[in-house]
């Protein structure tokens, strides 16, 4: 059992989890931008994220990439309950256009890219 901080922080027992660094959520023209969300914090964050990824790879820390895959088209993966909540809380923004459709630009990673041996969770 890992009991000390140095043991727990050892690269063999550590992972950097990158969640939703996707065009949909970070890029001009992505779903959040089209919805009118403020993306002003994304650009200042990206150089830091690049450095963090580079340092994690250099330290042999496992990188795990989370990549959403869903849409709101006729074959959507979102539950009816979720869509109803989106309509009530966000004026239906998610029901007006697809978000993170598999294989589309919106679902692609934004200014970062997993290496072939890194884990992608979709």
What residue ranges belong to the model's regions?
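Glycine-rich oxoanion-binding loops at beta->alpha junctions
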Residues: 114-115, 119-122
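Active-site acidic carboxylates
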Residues: 1-115
């Amino acid at each position: 059992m890992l009991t000390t901080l140095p043991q727990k922080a050892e690269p063999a027992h550590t992972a950097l989890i990158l969640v939703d660094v996707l065009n949909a959520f970070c890029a001009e023209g992505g779903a959040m931008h089209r919805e009118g969300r403020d993306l002003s914090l994304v650009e200042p964050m990206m150089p830091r994220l690049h450095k963090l990824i580079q340092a994690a790879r250099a330290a042999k820390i496992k990188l795990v990439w989370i990549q959403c895959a869903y849409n709101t088209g006729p074959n959507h993966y979102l539950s009816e309950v979720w869509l109803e909540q989106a309509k009530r809380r966000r004026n239906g923004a998610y029901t007006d256009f697809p978000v993170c459709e598999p294989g589309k630009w919106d679902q692609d990673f934004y200014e970062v890219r997993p290496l072939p041996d890194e884990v992608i969770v979709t």
